[in-house]
Amino acid sequence: MPPAPAGTIAPAGTIAPAEAVTPLLRGIAVLRRLTEAPGGTLSLSALEKTTGLARSTVDRLTATLARMGHVRLDGRDVTLAPRLMELGNAYLAALRLPALLSARADELADELDESVSLAVGDRDGIRFIHQATRRRAMSLSFRIGDLLPAERTAPGPLFAADWTEADWRHWRERRAADPADHTFPAVPPSEHPTPDEDFVLRTAKAATNDHALDDQLIEPGLVALSVPVRDPGTGRVACVASVVSHTSRHTAPDLRTALLPRLRAAVAAMEDDLRTAPPPAPAPPRAGLATWTGASKQELGREFVESLARGLTVLTAFDEGRSALTLTQVAQATGLARATARRALITLGHADLLAPAPGNTFTLTPRVLSLGFPPLSRTSLPEIAQPHLTALADRVHESTSLAVLSESGEEIQYTARASTTRVLSARVTVGARLPARDTAPGHVLLALPEARTQGYALVDEELEAGLRSLAVPVRDRTGRVVAALNVAMHAARRTAAACRTDILPELSRTATLIEADLSVAGRFVHVPPT
């Protein structure tokens, strides 16, 4: 069989199967390099260098990912986009644990005033699937999807208690090859790696005590206490719940003494929730996926890498109630030919994103979260909206902005904006506050009768002579209005009627685009409004 092509993500010491789809492996490599980059952004030349791919290949791969909404192209820079989170969402939905247990974790965090996390095992590491953090000067910086080495965490020994000899061998090989943990970008490098035997002993102790401690193994000051959440049907560890603190608040022994009983009670409630949860109703598969990729290929030609788009589409076939799928089910869900779906499954399995399961089925692995989820899980609503605001301002040639309602409900606060270069333009700075009842965004956010009936608000010269403002609501995935999208202009440039015919359709279209991104980003993650 041929060796893995340059820029693919073949596991160390393995070669890609003959049936593997090379463009799909290369696209996955691009996404992983972007995930590891600061801010989820790299230049095209940096991607060329870090993946080892030809520049023309990088250009086609990123153009395809941009067409899918997974990245954003800004000149020579490539940035991860919120729509990419649909891949991680597929894993989290199929897993069901965040949907069933996150409320318990959030309640525990509120009660203890400490950060609480849920994590699953990922080969020789642990990966976060939920975070309930506290806002403090010293706060937890780990993100959903971050991968940590098992031996430097509290959950690690609890997962290692179920490792096979092959798992332990793989772990020792990894430690020998990377003693400083450079392959785990979420943690600082280990300056003084502990002996392997230390983790073996911690694992044996965790198996006996059914809990584990992290006493500043990741960095000085960080301590954690973990208890396993077991699957009621199998008794195996489904995930691990952890309370994380700082030595300025708790020492590691103090965590065990003061918080272990409450953590155990919360875990018992989680296990009850798993036991009594009704079977999931299978989510309907997304229709027309194969048709969409074919149409995009027709439109863009060789600049659209259809095999990459189809391969990533296979990941989205999984969902709640669709956690284990056969080849036939994947082909039916995506509209792909069986042969195409089969090659995609083989490739995704080689990339450690899929694993075989009983009954000739496949399941997603936690490694799906390595495709952009950690940096994107911290995305705020203004960050989601900003590129859409800029595009809207370019189309209508007027200043655009996003605003939210203050806690008092008496003011609006501008959280994002895009300006034009007109001699006369509305200039409102991010962070500025204005009376809600005197502004179009305020009318929308307050749901005043006329704005609620029309679905938009048009305000003339209430704040300043000559200023005309038009706003529409932005809703989250539950339908709740969370922000207002606004275009402001000088009244002399357009009549009120012209605003409704020329600006309102563009404004509504942009709000729909923001809502689509917000719906994906907010499925399993809290998206801050500011």
PLM region descriptions:
Residues 105-117, 203, 389-397, 401-404, ...:
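Short regulatory alpha-helical segment in sensory/regulatory domains of signaling proteins that mediates
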Residues 117-123, 131-132, 402-408, 415-418:
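Short hydrophobic alpha-helical segments used for membrane anchoring or interfacial signaling
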Residues 1-89, 272, 291-373, 512, ...:
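N-terminal helix-turn-helix
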Residues 230-236, 475-481:
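Flexible loop/coil segments at beta-strand boundaries within sensory signal-transduction domains
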Residues 220-228, 465-474:
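A short beta-strand signature within small-molecule sensing/ligand-binding domains used
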Residues 204, 209, 237-301, 452-454, ...:
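Juxtadomain coupling helices with adjacent low-complexity linkers
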Residues 83-110, 140, 367-395, 413-414:
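Conserved segment of winged-helix/HTH DNA-binding domains
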Residues 140-218, 406, 412-465:
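Short, solvent-exposed recognition segments
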